[in-house]
Amino acid sequence: MKTIATVVLVFAMMIAGAVERPRLDVYPVKDGRAIVALANEHPAMFVVSLNDQEGTLVFHRESKESQTGYRKLFDFSGLKDGRYELSVKVNTTTVKKPITIQQGTLNVGESEFRFDPYFTWSGNVLKISYLNFDGDPLRLSIDGEWGNLYDASLGREFNTMLGYDLSALDKGNYTVVLSGGDKQYVYHLKK
């Protein structure tokens, strides 16, 4: 049991060390405007999105080249009162910041981090690790060239670490899909 706990701890530390740690700040200035600033340790491509409380996309921008920072003055004055979510995706890390607009005043909440799952394929074993911050019911499916081979509900556990021995599968291309809530992560492997 001690060995398993050590392996899990080492695996979790490897994942934590491999992800980006971008910093997202929103500084309200005046008249419904705010400076949005992103800083990242390493140059990377990123996607900035702003969604309203219904999930409707209000703003979207993808970087055209890798960079370590982004700064833009946003004008929120034309938006209706309500809750919004500003998110920035840098590689496999997403930083979310809730923003509430009420009578032209911006209130900015704390940053929340989300990480894409980690997939690895080696020696006929598929390993998956995922931190389910939102507590969504998770589902895993494995599809081959001939259709669905495996489909299972994984529950709502926060820390999901799985290993699948796929040695019995024929050679070919396979698609692994981990989904939960409105998120879907796809991993392709060739056996």
Each language-model region and where it sits:
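Start-of-domain marker
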Residues: G17-G69
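Short, glycine-anchored, charge-dense loop/turn motifs used at functional sites
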Residues: D52-L57, Y84, D143-L149, Y174
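Bacterial Sec-dependent N-terminal signal peptides
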Residues: M1-R23
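Short, surface-exposed loop/turn motifs with a glycine/proline- and acidic-biased composition
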Residues: E65-S87, R156-V177
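Short, compositionally biased P/S/T/A/G/V-rich stretches that sit at domain boundaries
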Residues: V19-V26, Q102-Y118
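Surface-exposed interaction/gating patches
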Residues: Y118-L149, F158
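Short beta-strand/loop motifs in extracellular/secreted proteins, especially
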Residues: A44-F46, D136-L138, Y174
